[in-house]
């Protein structure tokens, strides 16, 4: 959600418009990079390959236009007829500048049964699936991957703005570097699995407490309501056992997939605790103001504190409060009574106006007119020609407007 600029800095209105996030550090963004966290949780993630990218390949992703390597098609007799033409233009092959990366991508596709889904360090090119023949992230060839990466605004953000609104991390050095660290970019190829989108969930963690959960797909699925308690229990146990004490940052957002029969939880992604991460069915202001769930409290055996927590069923193990219990403890218990017992698990309800968006195109703001895409794929000259034609059209429209105003 974008922040709204205000001229009255420091005013109450301005303060409300600024979400109360803690500073987002460079290290937090790096910890959410796939190549950092996936090796720590390899057994919890779907099968994948991580390919380090060379500077020449990163430059290719930065470059304007979409120029793909030639497909490896066998020559035909018609091709032989023109092979001796000295004026024939050789088809551009950008992969000549990064042959190692190209070869590793081919090899990884073969190792992962011929179908993969790509992403960079943080983002997958989900906004570019309209460019794919399958209308999803499924890729069978290197060119399928290059086309998605080159067409995606999400990938461009990974490349150009990974540390927007971040601050240096002072916990690692008394004199932190003021400039953002250099990013070692990687291409992640995950074995293609036809995920059931209704069983993907986003989970929000604040100060190592699982705060709330929601479904990722914003359509209504009636069967999820019967499974809500089971799924919440699975996610809570997964977090407590696998992520709570092992991830370096205390606040983060993680995505999971829990396929039928809903016994195993797969870790799909880890995202920053930052405004750039989509809160989906929540708002960030709502999340930041949430009280921590108190969970199932156990009896305290400490002789010093001499009081007993309430158990899950709400019955105290003692009829009277110990005399040593202080007023502050009463206030704490009163605050806990107001707090939720379990993390909120939000699902799309049947009567939600957004519940039936099957025909609504995702990421439509990132799409381009077909003419622009076609021009970019003809090579560097194609886009220049298209821009020239576009300027001519605008010029003619301006002349026609001037003529009409004179009349």
From Swiss-Prot:
Mg(2+) binds at residues 269, 271. One of its GO terms (cellular component) is cytoplasm. InterPro entries: CDC123 (IPR009772). ATP binds at residues 119, 122, 124, 126, 190-191, 200, 202, 216, 255, 269, 271. GO terms for biological process: eukaryotic translation initiation factor 2 complex assembly. GO terms for molecular function: ATP binding; magnesium ion binding; protein folding chaperone. It is found in: Cytoplasm. It comes from the Eukaryota. The keyword Protease does not apply. The keyword tRNA processing does not apply. Keywords: ATP-binding, Chaperone, Cytoplasm, Magnesium, Metal-binding, Nucleotide-binding. Residues 68-99, 312-346, 374-407 are annotated as: Disordered. Its main location: cytoplasm. Residues 77-92, 325-339 have a biased composition (Acidic residues). Coiled coil: none annotated. Belongs to the CDC123 family. ATP-dependent protein-folding chaperone for the eIF2 complex. Binds to the gamma subunit of the eIF2 complex which allows the subunit to assemble with the alpha and beta subunits. This is Translation initiation factor eIF2 assembly protein. It comes from Emericella nidulans (strain FGSC A4 / ATCC 38163 / CBS 112.46 / NRRL 194 / M139) (Aspergillus nidulans).
């Amino acid at each position: 959600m974008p922040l709204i600029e205000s001229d009255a800095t420091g005013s109450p209105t301005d303060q409300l418009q600024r979400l109360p996030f803690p500073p987002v550090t460079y290290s937090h963004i790096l910890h959410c990079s796939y190549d950092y966290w996936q090796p720590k949780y390899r057994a919890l993630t779907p099968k994948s390959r991580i390919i380090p990218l060379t500077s020449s390949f990163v430059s290719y992703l930065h470059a304007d236009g979409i120029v793909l390597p030639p497909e490896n098609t066998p020559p035909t007799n018609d091709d032989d007829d023109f092979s001796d033409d000295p004026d024939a233009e050789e088809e551009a092959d950008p992969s000549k500048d990064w042959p190692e990366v190209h070869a590793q991508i081919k090899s990884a596709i073969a190792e992962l049964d011929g179908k993969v889904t790509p992403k960079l360090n943080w983002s997958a090119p989900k906004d570019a699936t309209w460019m794919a023949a399958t209308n999803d992230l499924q890729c069978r060839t290197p060119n399928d991957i290059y086309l998605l990466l080159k067409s995606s605004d999400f990938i461009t953000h990974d490349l150009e703005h990974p540390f927007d609104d971040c601050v240096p991390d002072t916990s690692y050095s008394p004199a932190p570097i003021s400039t953002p660290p250099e990013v070692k970019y990687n291409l992640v190829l995950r074995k293609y699995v036809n995920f059931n989108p209704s069983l993907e969930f986003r989970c929000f963690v604040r100060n190592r407490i699982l705060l709330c959960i929601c479904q990722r797909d914003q359509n209504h699925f009636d069967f999820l309501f019967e499974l809500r308690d089971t799924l919440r229990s699975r996610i809570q146990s997964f977090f407590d056992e696998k992520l709570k004490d092992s991830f370096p940052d205390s606040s983060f957002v993680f995505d999971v997939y829990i396929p039928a029969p809903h016994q195993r939880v797969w870790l799909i992604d880890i995202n920053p605790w930052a405004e750039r991460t989509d809160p989906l069915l929540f708002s960030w202001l709502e999340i930041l103001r949430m009280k921590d769930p108190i969970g199932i409290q156990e009896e305290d055996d400490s002789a010093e504190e001499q009081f007993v927590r309430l158990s899950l069923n709400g019955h105290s193990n003692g009829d009277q409060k110990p005399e040593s219990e202080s007023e502050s403890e009463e206030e704490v218990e009163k605050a806990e009574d107001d707090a939720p017992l379990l993390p909120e698990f939000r699902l799309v309800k049947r009567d939600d106006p957004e519940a039936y968006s099957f025909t609504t195109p995702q990421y439509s703001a990132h799409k381009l007119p077909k003419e622009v895409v076609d021009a970019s794929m003809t090579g560097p000259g194609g886009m220049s020609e298209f821009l020239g034609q576009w300027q001519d059209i605008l010029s003619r429209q301006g002349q026609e407007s001037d003529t009409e105003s004179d009349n």
